[in-house]
Every structure is written in C-alpha cells, then in structure tokens.
A protein has these predicted regions:
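Outer membrane beta-barrel transmembrane domains
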Residues: 101, 111-146
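Residues that define the transmembrane beta-barrel architecture of outer-membrane proteins
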Residues: 1, 22-32, 78-82, 139-143, ...
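Outer-membrane beta-barrel translocator domains and adjoining extracellular loop/strand segments
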Residues: 15-20, 59-68, 110-117, 170-176
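Short loop/turn motifs that connect adjacent beta-strands in outer-membrane beta-barrel proteins
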Residues: 1, 38-50, 92-97, 150-155, ...
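Well-ordered mid-protein domain cores that form the structural environment of catalytic cofactors
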Residues: 1-49
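Transmembrane beta-strands of outer-membrane beta-barrel pores
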Residues: 7-11, 53-59, 102-106, 151, ...
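Residues on the lipid-exposed face of transmembrane beta-strands in outer-membrane beta-barrel proteins
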Residues: 1, 5, 32-38, 84-90, ...
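Long, repeat-rich segments with strong aromatic
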Residues: 132-184
Length: 193
C-alpha cells in the first residue's frame, strides 16, 4: 500500500487517445492518494485500488473551440475532487481485467461539512445519491467501468469503457435510465516492440 501527495496530472482509463474520466492534457493538480503499488493477491484473483482526493482550479484563459459556448454553473472556481478506482483480475480468467471508477467534484463554496469524508472522500459513500446527499448541492458524480483483455504474445489489448455523468437515485433509476448522459469507448491497442 502506498500513500502520497502529488501535483502530477493523471490518466484514468484504458483509452489510448481519450479517456472518459481523467486525461493528462491539463496541468497537474494538488492531491493525495492512497492505493496499491502492485496487485494484491487474493484466492479469487488480484485486486488494485486507488483513492484520490484533491483540489481542481479552473484555468480561465482557456476558451472553447466554439466561441458561442458559455460556461454553465460554477466552473471557474476551485472544486474538490474525490476519486475511487478499483481493478480486479480474476484468477480463473487470466489476462482479463475489470475496473470500476467513481469520481465526485463539488465547489469549495458548497462544502457540505467540515468532515474530511464529506468532500475529499465522498467517493467512498454509498452508490445511490438519495442515501448520501440531497439534490440541492452542486455535486457532480461521474462513474465509469471498463473491461480489457490483454494478448501478451501479440503485445496487444482490446478494451471497452462505459461511463455516465449523473448519479442515480436507486437501482431502478440506474437500469431504466443508464444511457442518460453516457459515453463509451471501444478500442484495440497494439504496442510495437
């Protein structure tokens, strides 16, 4: 298990040229992390996890590609980030990986309380939003999951990632309206030796 403080930029997801949750184009941000530096072996397979909490600051000088687009809401202030990533490699299906990611951002002005778990570690709270928060706070939840299969002899992998940018109220809401504000990535990656 590793614990760290950093300001590096992060990439999260299997995509080679794009990512649904976090990509390394913007500058780094101040954050702390707790996670595994190598897979933890269990009888059912290997598990890796990473918990990240930090602050994001908007860069006001960067504009949109389309000049007619405007910022909506409070995007120019500082926001808290809470992120949880868990990866599983089953012992019975070698070279196959399943990963679940969950991230929250909330404006620093709307900090729900002074407890660390309510803003930096909010990603550890229950999945459905009516359990942990009302809908009045400007909290943004992003969830993604991906599967990838690695072909070691060919130095290649195939992957699929699916994510959405809205917290569900319950299991029924998740299953009936899972395409609301969703995105997906499908790809094949080949590394030339």
């Amino acid at each position: 298990i590793s614990v760290g403080v950093s300001s590096q930029n992060l990439w999260l997801g299997p995509g080679q040229f794009s990512s649904l949750l976090m990509y390394s184009n913007p500058p780094g941000f101040n954050h702390f992390s707790i996670g595994t530096n190598r897979p933890l072996k269990t009888p059912l397979g290997s598990v890796e996890f990473n918990i990240i909490g930090g602050t994001l600051t908007a860069i006001e000088r960067q504009g949109f590609e389309n000049r007619n687009l405007k910022y909506y809401g409070n995007f120019l202030g500082t926001r808290y980030l809470s992120l949880l990533s868990i990866s599983y490699n089953p012992v019975f299906f070698k070279n196959f990986y399943l990963t679940a990611n969950r991230a929250f951002t909330l404006p620093t002005q709307e900090k729900p309380s002074s407890k660390l778990t309510d803003y930096y570690l909010i990603a550890l709270k229950p999945l459905f939003r009516n359990v942990y928060q009302d809908n009045t706070a400007a909290i943004d939840q992003i969830i993604s999951g991906f599967a990838k299969y690695v072909f070691p002899k060919e130095n290649a992998e195939i992957y699929f990632e699916y994510g959405w940018n809205d917290g569900s109220s319950n299991l029924r809401d998740l299953t009936l309206d899972n395409s609301h504000s969703s995105a997906s990535i499908l790809g094949i990656k080949k590394i030339q030796p």
